[in-house]
Amino acid sequence: MAAPVRRSVVFVTGNAKKLEEVTQILGDSSPYTLVARKIDLPEYQGEPDEISVQKCREAARQIRGPVIVEDTCLCFNALGGLPGPYIKWFLEKLKPEGLYKLLAGFEDKSAYALCTFAFSTGNPEEPVKLFKGQTHGVIVEPRGPRDFGWDPCFQPDGYDQTYAELPKAVKNSISHRYRALSELSAFFLQSNPTEAPSSPS
């Protein structure tokens, strides 16, 4: 019997590390094959959900087909949730060391990482669906490899290593991205029951 045909969905990213991580987490069970595309999208401002929906709608308009957009926030509780959705610019200017120093005057070093995946079928009449995951932790002096954003300064609760120091398999089983992708994957399988593999390959 022929294997089910996997449909493709465009994942908007120019970040090879992010694509690698998302592909690893989704695994072979997804009825969709990810196709990475770098698209120039406007830099929206507002609440995280609003930003995700706007970006996904614009990406779907450009792609004219199914599309996934990811947004990540790093929220410091002492700063009322900042940097939040603006973490990319904070990181570019401050690096992980600067993010750590932002909390130098605060006793509360707690933070949470929030990942939102927005999915559009490509049909502008249909609503954008959001899938969110959150991981709580603390901001620490940077440790570990510097090849993936703010990972060196975020230590998840229950661990004595930063995201950067943790083995990939461990990070991918607890991360904010993993939690959001679990929701997205469940939705894909639920909405494509006939296309999901009946047994592990």
Swiss-Prot record:
This is Inosine triphosphate pyrophosphatase. One of its GO terms (biological process) is deoxyribonucleoside triphosphate catabolic process. It comes from Gallus gallus (Chicken). Mg(2+) binds at E43. Its EC number is 3.6.1.66. The lineage of its organism: Eukaryota, Metazoa, Chordata, Craniata, Vertebrata. It catalyses: ITP + H2O = IMP + diphosphate + H(+); dITP + H2O = dIMP + diphosphate + H(+); XTP + H2O = XMP + diphosphate + H(+); N(6)-hydroxy-dATP + H2O = N(6)-hydroxy-dAMP + diphosphate + H(+). GO terms for molecular function: dITP diphosphatase activity; ITP diphosphatase activity; metal ion binding; nucleoside triphosphate diphosphatase activity; nucleotide binding; XTP diphosphatase activity. Pyrophosphatase that hydrolyzes the non-canonical purine nucleotides inosine triphosphate (ITP), deoxyinosine triphosphate (dITP) as well as 2'-deoxy-N-6-hydroxylaminopurine triphosphate (dHAPTP) and xanthosine 5'-triphosphate (XTP) to their respective monophosphate derivatives. The enzyme does not distinguish between the deoxy- and ribose forms. Probably excludes non-canonical purines from RNA and DNA precursor pools, thus preventing their incorporation into RNA and DNA and avoiding chromosomal lesions. Belongs to the HAM1 NTPase family. It is found in: Cytoplasm. Gene3D superfamilies: 3.90.950.10. One of its GO terms (cellular component) is cytoplasm. Pfam families: Ham1p_like (PF01725). SUPFAM superfamilies: ITPase-like (SSF52972).
